[in-house]
Amino acid sequence: NNAKLKYDDNWKEIGFELSPYLKFNTDINSNSIKKFISNLLPEGKGLEFVSEFFHISKANQFSLIEAIGNETAGAITFTSNKELSTNFREISNEELTQRIINRDKVNITVWDKKTRLSLAGVQDKLPLVVLGNDKYGIGEGKIASTHILKFEKNENIHLVLNEYFCMKLGKLCGLNTAEVEIKKFDTQNVLFVKRFDRKLLINEDGAFKVLKKHIIDGCQILD
């Protein structure tokens, strides 16, 4: 089936083109739209899990992106016209530790019977709100995550350390890499990656909001 994208006239005045191949005032190629969406979805086992969780075919990219599209990479939200409630669910250090230890038994991306897997790639990862001083939580609606947590694998126990080393080395070489930190939960090393497409603002009274910044990856740039 052919996919179509039409920008709202008001968006054309105040917004931006989503990618170099999704331009204003042109007939947008259907394949470019599908590729853009595809590169926002998880891959491998992550895609299989999301497909099974929502009972949606892996080939039905548009239904999948609607299901998990409240917080994809960048600033764009994919959703129906339903108004999403905004909530912040705090997670204690103890609860997070137990979920990390038992992630082989209970999928780390499922919290409160909802999947939080909304990022591209094949690695296990968890989007999380980090407010400092070991205060963690999961946001819904207008509250977006500030960090991405990545985990070790049984077959590759040095995965976290290797990615941390590469990110730090890249920064020393002058590359604008994301801020990373390794935190230990019981015996598990976890990589905290500060999202460069998010900005956390905290008021003096403790109220906070997370701003989103639009980004695209190399695949979306090259179509």
Describe each region flagged by the PLM.
Residues 1-223:
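Phosphate/dinucleotide-binding and metal-coordinating scaffold of catalytic cores
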